[in-house]
Amino acid sequence: MVLLLGLIVIGGVTFFISNAPSEEQQQKSEEMAMQKTPGYETMTAVAQIANTHLLENAILNIQVTPKDDYEVVLLQLQTTEFLTEDILLKNTYNLLQDIRKIETIDTFTVAWFALINSENTEVLTLTFNRQALEQAAKISYNELPSIVTDYRKHESLN
């Protein structure tokens, strides 16, 4: 009787272990679930654009907030050295040429950070609505402040 019970338990454990998903299958399932997450496609597209136009490790954070049929995106970037407002505007302009092609983005904010007195500080932030994103293709980089819905500049950029 005990022997029979032991065989049943061992058989059940063996069956359970053999039917458990492998680590690879588990990872694939998780990746597929992430791809179905609202905003995931936009987040990966924004990351690819930023990595194409900027130095490696420039991305601090990307937040995509789905709102009905559109998305609100926040891209936080790190400068490797303290740059001028002019250079940050040029870099932002270059990003916008591809960002504007992502039609689901309704509001796009780019925030630049730099080390000031050993502290990571937000030095320039620009927020664009959909209309401003479209306009960015028709103006020069130094006109970006005139089309944004929000423009914040740290005093160190003066």
Tell where the protein language model's regions lie, with residue ranges:
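Solvent-exposed loop/turn segments at secondary-structure junctions
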Residues: 80-83, 116-118
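Hydrophobic membrane-insertion alpha-helices, especially the h-region
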Residues: 2-15
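Polar/charged, Gly/Pro-rich intrinsically disordered segments
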Residues: 52-74, 106-158
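Short, non-transmembrane amphipathic alpha-helical segments
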Residues: 85-106
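Surface-exposed flexible segments
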Residues: 26-35, 90-93, 117-130
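Hydrophobic single-pass membrane-insertion segments
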Residues: 12-25
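Stable alpha-helical elements in mature extracytoplasmic
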Residues: 42, 46, 88-92, 140
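Short edge beta-strands and adjacent turn/loop segments
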Residues: 26, 33-80
